[in-house]
Amino acid sequence: MSKSIGIDLGTTYSCVGHFSNNRVEIIANDQGNRTTPSYVAFTDTERLIGDAAKNQVAMNPHNTIFDAKRLIGRKFDDPEVQSDMKHWPFKVISKDGKPVLQVEYKGETKTFTPEEISSMVLMKMRETAEAYLGGKVTDAVVTVPAYFNDSQRQATKDAGLIAGLNVLRIINEPTAAAIAYGLDRSNQGESNVLIFDLGGGTFDVSLLTIEEGIFEVKATAGDTHLGGEDFDSRLVNHFIQEFKRKNKKDITGNARAVRRLRTACERAKRTLSSSAQASIEIDSLFEGIDFYTSITRARFEELCADLFRKTMEPVERVLRDSKVDKASVNEIVLVGGSTRIPRVQKLVSDFFNGKEPCKSINPDEAVAYGAAVQAAVLTGDTSEKTQDLLLLDVAPLSMGIETAGGVMTPLIKRNTTIPTKKSEIFSTYSDNQPGVLIQVFEGERARTKDCNLLGKFELSGIPPAPRGVPQIEVTFDVDANGILNVSALEKGTGKTQKITITNDKGRLSKEEIDRMVAEAEKYKAEDEAESGRIQAKNHLESYAYSLRNSLDDPNLKDKVDASDKETVDKAVKETIEWLDSNTTAAKDEFEAKQKELESVANPIMAKIYQAGGAPGGMPGAAPGAAPGAAPGAAPGGDNGPEVEEVD
């Protein structure tokens, strides 16, 4: 059976899991962390993804990209994109009405779409899984906020394609979390479960009924632009004002200072979840001024009060839409790191008249856990836990067409279970009208100008007839990913026209995706070449230094001819000088230099060994050996130290 994974592609952190032997493994990355920052950085020499990218963000704020999820599937002039751009240190420009990210990479100006940046994070998650599972992994379920619209879902699916994944299904984050909660509780009769998912950048609430392995979403609501980052921003603005008051200086123009402050604010926010006060200490924040201050939990709650209160609106809406009263909610499950904030927990508990939320699931890992289970189901896993699992999700937004006068006429109402298909008959608006323009919208407002245009197409060649006579059957078909296909049929002539909404101008074309896939492979190869180059450089450097140290070893001093020592010393000195002035040399240059040094040193070191006095663990004579590995240990010696490579 092929190995499948579930990926929670988050705004700020991502997580990957794999289901086998009736359980889910959440897979740690190469740094040992079970979540990976959704960051990609570009430098003069390399591309960094995950922890390495986030760790250098203060030094390289303009070329370190994060929050791609707040851009994906949106238009450049989206008000939320415009407001986010004000506090991002990286550059977002418009290309064909879509936002693209502009960075300096290897000395050139490059642009990347949000899909490409997300694909790099997905590729990192895929590689994390491959390293652990020991083999190639392509099948994946990727999660999105329940409230993501059609274009955001499609763009996320494209990101998966660019990362070389076969995206089995796009599933909603709260639904995935519900699987994590309900998988072991499937035999407890029917229960109503409310998932409250407040992450780094998005917020969802879903109400599900869980019974014997069937997870049925009754309603969903949310805000695709509310999360932990918004709380950080409130703290950042608060401290920028405080710094201004104390020092009469404004740091907003200095990207590095603002970034260091944001990192400190994120840390303080986490501290405030367990302590009543947090201190902020940043040395030389701006123009040599140290910034030492503190904040109380009460003040933090006051700064974010309106945002916290805002989380209750979708809860009310979900209960209203699903016609369930709050007393009938059996369990409340908190998901997403931001639900650790005590004030948020209290608001939820108070809303449900003091009912305590479930504490048994990990808020950072639940979504990836559920996605991994669903991936196993979709690749044919039949273990006892998954064999009866059935997910019934819903469309988060109503979808319909524009009719005369700019009216939104929904064919599929929000919270309809998907997959679903719905047809309606429409007609012409004026006599002898030769064609109709079918414009597809999503949203809850009565006028299409207040809704989101998904796409449009023309059905032409209608025979002349009085208005209202031709019969045009419009069919909406939403698949299990929540992605829409629309077709129109003119009954008189049998003419049809169809559109997968995603062929709209906002979507990447097949050619663009193919190009991005090829580029992704190229970048990956470049990354691997760069790490090979660094490795060769480090090998040479540590070989040179360990040679020098060996010759200075008191036990060896009297066994080395002065002239031999001088020869090796000179070669080592030349090598180190060459290294200092050729840090960007190619891998084979470093390897050639190592061979050159070995050809001088090996005969001399061999002479010392034959004299029988070498301690274990001398610099190896074998070309390419790890520095410090002895070529056959000295008589009576041990095999030398185990050497660990330090990058």
Curated annotation (Swiss-Prot):
The modification Phosphothreonine is found at residues 36, 339, 417. Its main location: cytoplasm. CDD domains: ASKHA_NBD_HSP70_HSPA1. Residues 611-647 are annotated as: Disordered. InterPro entries: ATPase_NBD, Heat_shock_70_CS, HSP70_C_sf, HSP70_peptide-bd_sf, Hsp_70_fam. Residues 620-633 have a biased composition (Low complexity). The modification N-acetylserine is found at residue 2. It is found in: Cytoplasm. One of its GO terms (cellular component) is nucleolar peripheral inclusion body. Pfam families: HSP70 (PF00012). The modification Phosphoserine is found at residue 546. One of its GO terms (biological process) is chaperone cofactor-dependent protein refolding. Keywords: Acetylation, ATP-binding, Cytoplasm, Nucleotide-binding, Phosphoprotein, Stress response. GO terms for molecular function: ATP binding; ATP hydrolysis activity; ATP-dependent protein folding chaperone; heat shock protein binding; protein folding chaperone; unfolded protein binding. Belongs to the heat shock protein 70 family. NCBIfam families: PRK00290.1. This is Probable heat shock protein ssa2. It comes from Schizosaccharomyces pombe (strain 972 / ATCC 24843). The lineage of its organism: Eukaryota, Fungi, Dikarya, Ascomycota, Taphrinomycotina.
